[in-house]
Amino acid sequence: MTDRHHLLVHGATFAVVGDQGDISGVRGGGSPDGLFVRDARHLSRWQLTVDGAVPEVLTPVADGDAARCVLVPRGGRQEPPAHTLFREQAVGDGSFVESLRMTSNRPVPITVRIALTADADFTDQFELRSDHRTYAKTGAVRTRQVLDDGLEFGYRRGEWRSCTTITADPAPDAVEETGTGARRLVWTLELEPHGTAELVLRVMARPHGDKRALRVPRSPAAVRDHVLALEGGFFEGVAFPTGWPELAAACARGLTDLASLQVPATGPDGEELRVPAGGAPWFLTLLGRDALLASLFALPYRPQLAAATLPALAATQAKGESRSPLAQPGKIVHEVRHGELAHFGQVPYGRYYGSVDATPLFLVLLGAYVERTGDALLAWRLERHARAAIGWMLDHGGLTSRGYLVYRADEGGLANQNWKDSPGAICCADGSRPSGAVMAAGAQGYAYDALRRTAWLARTVWGDETYAALLEQAAADLRDRFQRDFWMPERSFPALALDGEGRRVDALASDAGHLLWSGLLDKEYGEVVGRRLLEPDFFSGWGVRTLASGQPAYHPLSYHRGSVWPHDNALITLGLARYGLHDEARTVAHALVDAATAAGHRLPEVLAGYGRDTHPEPVPCPHACVRESRSAAAPLALLTAVGGA
């Protein structure tokens, strides 16, 4: 986000507004504004004028759960403003509500004309990205209908139907055409001397297929009360560290964000669930890997996230090969999209299985959840899903045929299918990309942990000793192979990946820290790796870089080739603690907490890789999610790893 854009989030709904609360309807660029629900823009213009002019911003919108600003008519120092407009906005579930309070500053009656230009273009989020792609929409029709107390925008394309309804209290005096698809709602307010008048506008988005009976909140204050109640329940029982107030504040901020970043999902029996979304603005939907890691980080404090995430992912687990070759039996979904382009197959992400690591992470979380909570009932309920996930790992995943979990670039989808999924993220030190199949190091660590944890479930919950022994042997064999094939003795470090010919992809990357978290490396190798990650080419002062500097492939602003990811560092910190490297774990934890403190105690999705010694403030990465569930949960992982030290 730029300093002119502000994000409001509630579940699967978010809005991006400017300093004065307006929505401009921009397309392309880093952060289009609007009201978004289920991948579609349900408000594309929302622009206020007073007496025909755009008011001046006295106090701009500030980031928070509601957008508030103070506006006045433009004028000079010799003529104080005739009135002041107090504007407040908030988002609810599928809704947007605004309060406009106009106060006269004059001792005589005045008349003020307020106009609000509104439009809904129903653009899919994928159309708004700055990748210059275009999508045909043959037969698409947009409609506008004036209501007694507002108006309704509609959109249809084949069987696809969406609408946005705007109502106002009091009703507008007129609804005017603008010469475009937008409409202008107009009120003429008669204000008594120093009097006040208030307008309340409510927007209800009805995306395709949403049959829920939703109610628009009566006011932004009602949304605020609901959010406070939600956050209060989310905080209950969490013991924040008293000796480290900055970590306590980061944990509190993270829990607040996790509370707002939960989106609806459905379990195997049709039960309604709420699970962590990927992040806003671009990924406010179920992402398998992201939901699993956020739930893992929060597990000691908020196990209900895992209790919802696991059934939701079981319900979307692939049951057979479909038109997508990636939907193989037992595989856990990578991404679920609800938008128009996904519905018509114009993007592959409606239910997309392009992740090599979501499946083992599903098993890791299931084992960790049962071990932590003692809730064996969930393990019984999801037994067939867990066995199917193991089956995928051994069969389509490649453990039996290749010895490792393996993926291949998906034409039209993701070239890389581990957590570093941007093009070119898996590379050699010189920047060249591997050819053929890819066996990413971090995914092998997850597979090892998944095999061991599922063996424990088989023995202690399912009573299947034979299956447990089989999985334990598979884990031991994987560990032996990995240290033989991935370890680079000349660099005393594991390779980032193996290519299709089994050659080592030799970039020095942060993924090695995930092997510590999984426990895949022998203690001697693990200690070497852990200390290496704290050397200056890796450690920026704000965290461990995704790629060590000094390599030709390094770029401090690259998404995955030199940046610093909080969730990546949270896993590294947990791994350092696991291998007894407590000083190193505290160093990384303090760096991340300092980065959070510099940004209002909120960790972003990703930071630039610039060193703290050359730039004393953390630098944000362009196009990153402002709020992201893994980053929100990362302070909780730090608390687990190092306590309040």
Feature annotation, model-predicted:
Residues W380, R387-Q444, Q483-A548:
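Extended ligand-binding clefts on enzyme/binding-domain cores
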Residues D269, R302-W380, R387-S401, V406-A409, ...:
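Helix-terminus loop motifs that line ligand-binding clefts
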Residues A440-D464, A469-R479, S563-A599:
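Extended amphipathic alpha-helical segments enriched in small hydrophobics
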Residues T84, G92-S95, S104-T285, A376-W380, ...:
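Acidic/polar, glycine-enriched structural segments that form the non-catalytic walls/loops
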Residues M1-A82, G94, P107, D121-F122, ...:
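An extended acidic
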Residues W282-L286, R337-R372, W487-P536, S558-A645:
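C-terminal capping/lid segments that line or modulate ligand- or cofactor-binding pockets
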Residues P241-L247, A298-L310, Y369-R387, G398-S401, ...:
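Structural helix-adjacent loops and short alpha-helical linkers that scaffold large soluble proteins
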Residues G92-G94, N105-V108, P193-G195, L286-A308, ...:
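Short, solvent-exposed loop/edge-beta patches enriched in aromatic
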